[in-house]
UniProtKB/Swiss-Prot annotation:
Its EC number is 3.4.11.1, 3.4.11.10. One of its GO terms (biological process) is proteolysis. Belongs to the peptidase M17 family. Coiled coil: none annotated. This is Probable cytosol aminopeptidase. Binds 2 manganese ions per subunit.
Length: 503
């Protein structure tokens, strides 16, 4: 799909090209109970009051998400006009904008339009510039057009005909909007990779498959890839990671991807993604109902791979390292048992009270490994706890950090990227729940504050650098009839890196 940018100040009569240019449809926003303004006012004038008459008749009341097509409109070059309700102007925020653009894309994708002129990016949204609106609109469109059909015997062809979108933006934002197009396409491509990896079944997306995916990313985008096998992992003394992997016939992999966009001496940001390609719970076996969704337990790994791919496509001036410990968590005659004690790469001993709390066991060794890069920051991403889903549901990812400045950056990025996160507590008092009579610490701390104690466990391995943890158990995928990976938190992570790179 092709996206292009044209500067236009509708209030200064600069819209002639939009009014006369050939297009299958021009998209206009209508506020509830407000006089027309901007693009809608100009089109109304060119069509001799058609938009005003439609609004006055009540066919378009401006309620948020409502859409109405006008056909064979005279006075303009477009063959259709799509009116989109924006809701009340004083309540028009980022969510309202996203609702409006999503409604517009859904209406357009149900038609046979090929080329569209899109004016909604110029709407005033929480003091955001129109380049922000362009990026959000492209991501919303790519979200609507994403389909996972790779595993079907006859992959379904695209059901829409849309090929080209021309965005009108404020002239002062034209240059930035062109950058926003590049960023949005790269982000969408990274999210699609993340979704594809999550949606693949566990018998296809194995640890070896993830390793091969990392190698392909490296080859396609000029990155350096290291994929360590069992013997190399053993040599690193990653006893905690290996305690999870030991009962599976699928060999574990330890993936390291290096992106160098800045000077070699510049400290990298390290992203660590949990890569459990299928989680049965091990000896602490999960219930059978819904276990198929445990193929999504590698979505942390998928999001890290999708993010570094997006960073490479954007060409950000920053160094990034992606680390993915990946294996299956299976029962078996040689599986780790509740009560077993294992030794982590850091040397701390861990009493494994529950083998279904395995994500933290593979992440802790990866977090220790990250020390060798002397990182500017480390962010781990994991579908870690059901407790986080209970606490936050499916809207906000859980954010934990021992560094207020880093947490603030990530929260700012989450708002900018429309990828919500909520900071959770990490007080020292919660650490007491991880005490063990027999080892340095236990891998669970009981039912109370389960997401917090999981983050507390990880914090024991992150003392030498600024660190944050994203628990995406509620946001990485949707269940039920809408089952599928979401691609989150690629937008949040990518925006954080864009901000760090000053781009």
């Amino acid at each position: 799909m092709d996206f292009s940018i044209k500067g236009c100040d509708w209030s200064k009569g600069e819209a002639k090209g939009f009014l006369t240019g050939k297009s299958d449809c021009i998209v206009l926003g209508i506020f509830e109970a407000q006089t027309l303004s901007g693009a809608a006012l100009d089109i109304d004038t060119a069509t001799k009051g058609l938009i005003s008459r439609v609004v006055k008749a009540g066919d378009m009341d401006g309620k948020r998400g409502k859409t109405l097509f006008l056909h064979e409109v005279s006075g303009i070059g477009a063959s259709r006009v799509l009116l989109v309700g924006l809701g009340k102007q004083d309540a028009f925020n980022q969510k309202a904008y996203n609702d409006a653009v999503t409604a517009a894309w859904r209406a357009l994708l149900a038609t046979k339009v090929v080329q569209v002129t899109f004016s909604l990016a110029q709407l005033p949204v929480d003091e955001r510039s129109s380049d922000w609106g362009v990026r959000a609109a492209i991501l919303a469109l790519r979200n609507e057009t994403y389909r996972f059909t790779q595993m079907k015997s006859k992959p379904e062809p695209a059901s829409h005909t849309l090929k080209r979108v021309v965005f009108s933006v404020d002239p002062a934002d034209e240059k930035a909007a062109k950058v926003a197009v590049k960023q949005a396409v790269a982000l969408a491509n990274g999210m699609d990779l993340t979704r594809d990896l999550g949606n693949l079944p566990g018998n296809v997306c194995t640890p070896t498959y993830l390793g091969n995916t990392a190698k392909k990313i490296a080859k396609d985008w000029g990155l350096k890839a290291e994929v360590l096998g069992l013997k190399q992992i053993q040599a690193l003394k990653m006893g905690s990671f290996l305690s999870v992997a030991r009962a599976s016939v699928e060999p574990p992999q330890f993936i390291v991807l290096h992106y160098q966009g800045a000077a070699a001496k510049a400290a990298p940001v390290v992203l660590v993604g949990k890569g459990i390609t299928f989680d049965t719970g091990g000896i602490s076996l999960k219930p059978g109902e819904g276990m198929d969704e445990m193929k999504y337990d590698m979505c942390g790994a998928g999001s890290v791979l999708g993010t570094i791919r997006a960073v490479a496509e954007m060409g950000l001036k920053i160094n990034v390292v992606a680390i993915v410990p990946t294996c299956e968590n299976m029962p078996g005659g040689n599986a780790t048992k509740p009560g077993d004690i294992v030794t982590s790469m850091k040397g701390l001993t861990i009493e494994v009270l529950n083998t279904d709390a395995e994500g933290r066991l593979i992440l802790c060794d990866a977090l220790t490994y990250a020390e060798r890069f002397k990182p500017a920051a480390v962010i781990d991403v994991a579908t870690l706890t059901g407790a986080c889903v209970i606490a936050l549901g499916g809207h906000n990812s859980g954010l934990f950090s021992t560094n207020d400045a880093l947490a603030g950056e990530l929260l700012d990025a989450s708002r900018e990227a429309n990828d919500p996160a909520w900071r959770m507590p990490l007080d020292d008092e919660y650490q007491d729940q991880l005490k063990s009579n027999f080892a340095d610490l236990a891998n669970i701390g009981g039912r109370p504050a389960g997401a917090v104690t999981a983050a507390c466990f990880l914090s024991r391995f992150t003392e030498s650098y600024p660190w944050a943890h994203l628990d995406i158990a509620g946001t990485a995928w949707k269940g039920g009839a809408a089952k599928g990976a979401t691609g989150r938190p690629v937008p949040l992570l990518a925006q954080f890196l864009i901000d760090r790179a000053g781009q």
